[in-house]
Amino acid sequence: MKRITTLLLSVTTVTMTSLAGGLLHNTNQHIAFMRMMARGASHEIDAVYTNPAGLAFMDHDGWTLSLNIQSATQSRDALTTFALFPEADHTRLYKGKASAPVIPSLYGAYKKDRWTFSGFFGFTGGGGKCNFDSGLPVFDASIMAGIYGQTAALKQSMAQNPAVAPVLADPRVAGLLPLTADKYDINSSMRGRQYIYGLQLGATYKLLDWMSVYAGGRMNYFDGNYSGFVKVMPKPEMAATVQEIALSYPALAPTLSTLVNQNGEMANIDLDCSQTGWGVTPIIGVDLVWKGFTLAAKYEFKTNLNIENDTKTAIAEPAAFEAALADYKHGVNTPSDLPAVFYAALGYEFIPNKLRATVEYHYYDDKHAEMAHDKQKALRHGTHEVLGGVEWDINKTFTVSAGVQNTDYGLSDAYQTHTSFSCDSYSIGFGGAVNLSEKVKLNVGYFWTTYKDYDRSETDYFGTTLPGKDTYSRTNRVFGAGIDFKF
């Protein structure tokens, strides 16, 4: 069935490779970010990540350490309408579940006079784990369209051949051609895991009483695994009918064998591939302080990151499917660059040591960060983020804060795929801090993200020649707690 094979080759390649790319930004490293969002003008320990130049203005000489633990859950769903789906409204809901139950991060800084040396370890990117246990619409739609189109063409070819045309009068043959989705089962599952571990080291120097600078770097290590399978099996009634027809009409046996192989399968793909890679991100920053104002900026250079396959399983039956797994052969490298990033923040302390607020802007140059199959070129622009937050010290013991973030990814239909899709969003975070003593602070925060549904329609849905529509939706919830130490 050449058309089915061609469709599945393209579908499997697109779907599997999309798991290896995508927008992997992760800025919620410290609980202070969760509860305020805009931390780009911070002069506390979380500034190691958000505003490293600002560490020169910390209020404590000596060591400051911070340990943070977060727990995140996401849903990533696709509501798909396609003409060949057997449901009454031809619509199916495909649910994806992503989780990162424990997200740790560790901060450290040592300040002495005008110098501050700092370090950070955490998950700086990646989407955690995501499971599509009920499969994906791109698989189901493409397989259904391929099987229907191929068997419809077979019926037409038989009708034009006087030697076999009478066979079409047999109800068993007439009921089999063309094959509709109620005659076979598609069993598919996709699972992915992506984590980018970051280890950052750097130094801050106070040039003037109102100005400091930072230089450092972050070592990034990518760890991922992508596994999935697609199995197409005839229903028992169809399998029995195929056998009966083959016995009744031996001349049709070779043709029928293209529908169902000797193992009773119509298709079988199985993949288990781990990927690793690393790259170094140079980082510079500056912080200016004047009469209650703080103006800070940070720039992270683009990181070239190539990830290499360690493939344990790559089964494709029939053999024509092997090309679909070419990108996942053992030892193959795939680009997955981290984009250059620019942060700018303006903070103001309305009441000294009491009430402060910050507005902030982030830009991720995603269009120039190479992804698998040049996927970045499909973006309309890089990612823009605007943040704002306010923090109030109720007294010397208790602090409360809240903040918002709006994210615009510059998405396009060509960029989105079922396993790697993004949705523009806004986030709201809130929480507080408790000074357990002069040298120990407890932070607690919670934030949720509201995503805008993304609709895409195609007249030629993933090469099926039939129209289809997807609505992508996501949810995100994160809770965390952390503790800061000074000594």
Give names to the regions the model predicted:
Residues 114-117, 210-213, 292-295, 353-357, ...:
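Repeated loop/turn-to-beta-strand initiation elements of outer-membrane beta-barrel proteins
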Residues 4, 16-131, 145, 421, ...:
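N-terminal, post-signal peptide beta-strand-biased segments of exported outer-membrane/organellar beta-barrel
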Residues 109-112, 201, 205, 219, ...:
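Residue-level signature of outer-membrane beta-barrel architecture
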Residues 285-289, 293-308, 331-410:
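Detector for outer-membrane/organellar transmembrane beta-barrel domains
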Residues 432-434, 446, 473-487:
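Outer-membrane beta-barrel "beta-signal"
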Residues 83-89, 133-186, 223-272, 307-331, ...:
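Solvent-exposed loop segments that connect transmembrane elements
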Residues 46, 99-104, 195-199, 276-282, ...:
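Residues that define the transmembrane beta-barrel architecture of outer-membrane proteins
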Residues 65-73, 119-123, 215-219, 297-301, ...:
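Transmembrane beta-barrel strands of outer-membrane/channel proteins
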